[in-house]
């Protein structure tokens, strides 16, 4: 007798590994380019070293066996994790060995965090600035001190032990990477078992991960932070294991601990509301989110994800099947709906990676916005340098991941997409009306570009002609962001309605009180006006152009009217052969190349907007009578409404600290500012140049070498067009990002 129909049969979990599939051979790996027959022959021309770097991680080019590619990626993930653990270990070791963490912990409002002391070689010790408490070192802006305090670390010994633990984990990861490729490698069906993967990732990674973190926060972080907030010296606070072993210690701080698990099993959960809270707002002592709110949050997340990890059908015939869900997902106008998508995601890792990069990139930018509006860690909000750097960091990371999503979506289209498997499903229908999508996007970009920039040009012209009454500004013709103001109002009015007994709204950015710590503003209501409306439309413009470029690259990756057989030319190609004029720089790779520049444009405006807005309207000092004096004195609303204002009152005015940093502890940023400009300018040499020029130059240099009987055995070649563009964009972004980094650092460390 069958309980479920045959197609609902459970996926039985089997042993799905191969034993000893690949021998461990150092002799093979020692040969440069061992992964490619052509490269393994060694260099004939200088192009060899470029191809070596371009192809070393392109596992698709080694083999078309999906199982082998999957194993290589899986093994590489362990290698990546090992690098992450080594990097973390270094950060913790610096905290343990070279930092003023314990001094900062006892006085976080006046002492600045430092975890690097420069050795006195050729006068570099000038970089060791006075960070307070008699400590000389480089001020750090990673936010690690704040995170360590939040997790309950009170001594540098604890950091030291954690650093050693991270190295042990790194060794374990390296071993796992070798073991799961050479000794016990999973079969393809293991990688393709989407339901089991979802269950384990949701319940295990997110669910149990959050649960264990909630446990740590409740048993270690909460009591330690409560004592620190009360002014108890870090040396007098019991060690973490004492709180866990001695219930009376923690019951003095949180009385419900005295009752043990009785309220849990009698469903009287309200008893635990002394350490699982819904306060909302920020802790007035530290300017960070309430730790008891965060413990509550992680516990709730754990419950949700552990439940979610039981959603998908594996051994027992209950739960969702990914394939069924996707194929049932049809609308009235969407043809076959998502039929064929399951096969795409289980056979193309590029497609899966693309989706994950798009989601994680967006998430990183969302994180950036929450780090200042709802600062999660104690004393983070008043460390303006760290706030600015964390915002900048998460925004750049998000931008790169989103461009990566476009890149891998295009690689999927070129290498993995099978039109026969995708007839009349949503993906096919999007591809068939791609001209409408791209031309509409193009129109939107033109509209936004002319109108957003036009508003600024109007304002510059009116200000130049001495007609302030005719400008778009809060003092003349107002363009108030009414929808954004409505969202702010709804959120500030919602306190108490969004969560049971919540005392404050989620963020003071929406409205409410000024939270100050140590006479500095941690967070306060952010008022929006005409200036924000204008720059917001520049954001809309630059983001839409980035999307246009990336999406055009994906939708036209396989073919176009110009090159119907593009898929045969591959992901990157310079031109469609001789005699086909106008077919250069149209590969999917070239779209990623252009997308990177617009991503950089887009995010530069975002970072400049954030930096200036916060200095003008949020960050500053609070006097005894509650008056706030902001760093740049509210000049954003009137100065940022002209292009000239951005150049004069933001870029030029705020660059004074980095330009005048020579001879001070910030002088490294002055050198970086200069050097990064040079790297950026160097990129232009590759971007504004033709390959022929370089090849011709090389020929004459080779001629001179031959004359002197000094000719190299490896023939010099100019970079290919694609290589030149790659070198150009890499230096453009490195130069641009390092310029921004040094500009922000010198400015905000001086004034923040």
Curated annotation (Swiss-Prot):
**One GO CC term on file:** chloroplast thylakoid membrane
Q: Relay the cofactor remark from the entry.
A: P700 is a chlorophyll a/chlorophyll a' dimer, A0 is one or more chlorophyll a, A1 is one or both phylloquinones and FX is a shared 4Fe-4S iron-sulfur center.
Where does the chain cross the membrane?
Answer: 73-96, 159-182, 198-222, 294-312, 349-372, 388-414, 436-458, 533-551, 591-612, 666-688, 726-746
> What keywords tag this UniProt record?
4Fe-4S, Chlorophyll, Chromophore, Cyanelle, Electron transport, Iron, Iron-sulfur, Magnesium, Membrane, Metal-binding, Oxidoreductase, Photosynthesis, Photosystem I, Plastid, Thylakoid, Transmembrane, Transmembrane helix, Transport
Residues holding chlorophyll a: 685, 693
Q: What is its EC number?
A: 1.97.1.12
Q: Which NCBIfam families match?
A: psaA
Write out the function statement from the record: PsaA and PsaB bind P700, the primary electron donor of photosystem I (PSI), as well as the electron acceptors A0, A1 and FX. PSI is a cytochrome c6-ferredoxin oxidoreductase, converting photonic excitation into a charge separation, which transfers an electron from the donor P700 chlorophyll pair to the spectroscopically characterized acceptors A0, A1, FX, FA and FB in turn. Oxidized P700 is reduced on the lumenal side of the thylakoid membrane by cytochrome c6.
User: Record's family?
Assistant: Belongs to the PsaA/PsaB family.
Name by which UniProt lists this protein? Photosystem I P700 chlorophyll a apoprotein A1
Organism for this UniProt entry: Cyanophora paradoxa
Source lineage: Eukaryota, Glaucocystophyceae, Cyanophoraceae, Cyanophora
Q: Which gene encodes it?
A: psaA
């Amino acid at each position: 007798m069958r309980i479920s129909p045959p197609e609902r049969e459970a996926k039985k979990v089997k042993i799905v590994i191969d034993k000893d599939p690949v021998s461990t051979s150092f002799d093979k790996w020692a040969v440069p380019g061992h992964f490619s027959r052509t490269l393994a022959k060694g260099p004939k021309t200088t192009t060899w070293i470029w191809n070596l770097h371009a192809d070393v991680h392109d596992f698709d080019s080694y083999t078309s066996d999906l199982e082998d590619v999957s194993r290589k990626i899986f093994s590489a993930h362990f290698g990546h994790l090992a690098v992450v653990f080594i990097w973390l270990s270094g950060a913790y070791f610096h905290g343990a060995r070279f930092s003023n963490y314990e001094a900062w912990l006892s006085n976080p409002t006046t002492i600045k965090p430092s975890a690097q002391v420069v050795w006195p070689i050729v006068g570099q010790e000038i970089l060791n600035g006075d960070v307070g408490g008699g400590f000389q070192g480089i001020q750090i802006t990673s936010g690690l001190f704040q995170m360590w305090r939040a997790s309950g670390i009170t001594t540098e010994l604890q950091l030291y032990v954690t650093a050693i633990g991270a190295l042990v984990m790194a060794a374990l990861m390296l071993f796992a990477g070798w073991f799961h490729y050479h000794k016990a490698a999973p079969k393809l069906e293991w990688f393709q078992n989407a339901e089991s993967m979802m269950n384990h990732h949701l319940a295990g990674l997110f669910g149990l991960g959050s649960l264990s973190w909630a446990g740590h926060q409740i048993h270690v972080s909460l009591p330690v932070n409560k004592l620190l907030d009360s002014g108890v010296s870090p040396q007098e606070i019991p060690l973490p294991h004492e709180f866990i072993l001695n219930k009376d210690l923690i019951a003095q701080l949180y009385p419900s601990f005295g009752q043990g698990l009785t309220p849990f099993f009698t469903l009287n959960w309200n008893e635990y509301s002394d350490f699982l809270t819904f306060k909302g707002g920020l802790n007035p002592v530290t300017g960070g989110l309430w730790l008891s709110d965060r413990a509550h949050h992680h516990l709730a997340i754990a419950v949700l994800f552990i439940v979610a990890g039981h959603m998908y059908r594996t051994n027992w015939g209950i739960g969702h099947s990914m394939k069924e869900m996707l194929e049932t997902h049809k609308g009235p106008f969407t043809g076959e709906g998502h039929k064929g998508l399951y096969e795409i995601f289980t056979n193309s890792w590029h497609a899966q990676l693309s989706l994950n990069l798009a989601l994680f990139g967006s998430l990183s930018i969302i994180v950036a916005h929450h780090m200042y509006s709802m600062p999660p860690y104690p004393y983070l909000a008043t460390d303006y340098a760290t706030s600015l750097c964390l915002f900048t960091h998460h925004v750049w990371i998000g931008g790169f991941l989103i461009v990566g999503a476009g890149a891998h979506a295009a690689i999927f289209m070129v290498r993995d997409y099978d039109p026969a498997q995708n007839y009349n499903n949503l993906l096919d229908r999007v591809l068939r009306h791609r001209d409408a999508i791209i031309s509409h996007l193009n129109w939107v970009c033109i509209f936004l570009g002319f109108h957003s920039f036009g508003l600024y040009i109007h304002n510059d012209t009116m200000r130049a002609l001495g007609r302030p009454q005719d400008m778009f500004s809060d003092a003349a013709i107002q363009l108030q962001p009414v929808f954004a103001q409505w969202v702010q109002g709804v959120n500030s009015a919602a306190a108490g309605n969004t969560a049971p007994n919540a005392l404050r709204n989620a963020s003071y950015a929406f409205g409410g009180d000024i939270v100050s710590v140590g006479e500095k503003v941690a967070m306060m209501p952010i008022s929006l006006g005409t200036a924000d409306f204008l720059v917001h439309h520049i954001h809309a413009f630059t983001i839409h152009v980035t999307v246009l470029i990336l999406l055009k690259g994906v939708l036209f990756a396989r073919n176009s009217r110009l090159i119907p057989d593009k898929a045969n030319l591959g992901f990157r190609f310079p031109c469609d052969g001789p005699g086909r004029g106008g077919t250069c720089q149209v590969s999917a790779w070239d779209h990623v190349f252009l997308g990177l520049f617009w991503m950089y444009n887009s995010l530069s405006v975002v970072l400049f907007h954030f930096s200036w807005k916060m200095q003008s309207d949020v960050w500053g000092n609070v006097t005894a009578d509650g008056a706030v004096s902001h760093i740049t004195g509210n000049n954003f609303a009137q100065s940022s409404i002209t292009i000239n204002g951005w150049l004069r009152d933001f870029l030029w005015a705020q660059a004074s600290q980095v330009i005048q940093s020579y001879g001070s502890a910030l002088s490294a940023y002055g050198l970086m500012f200069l050097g990064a400009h040079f790297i950026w300018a160097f990129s232009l040499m590759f971007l504004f140049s033709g390959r022929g020029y370089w090849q011709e130059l090389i020929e004459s240099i080779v001629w001179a070498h031959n004359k002197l009987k000094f000719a190299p055995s490896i023939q010099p070649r100019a970079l290919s067009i694609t290589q030149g563009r790659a070198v150009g964009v890499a230096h453009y972004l490195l130069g641009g990002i390092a310029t921004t980094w040094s500009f922000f650092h010198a400015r905000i460390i001086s004034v923040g």
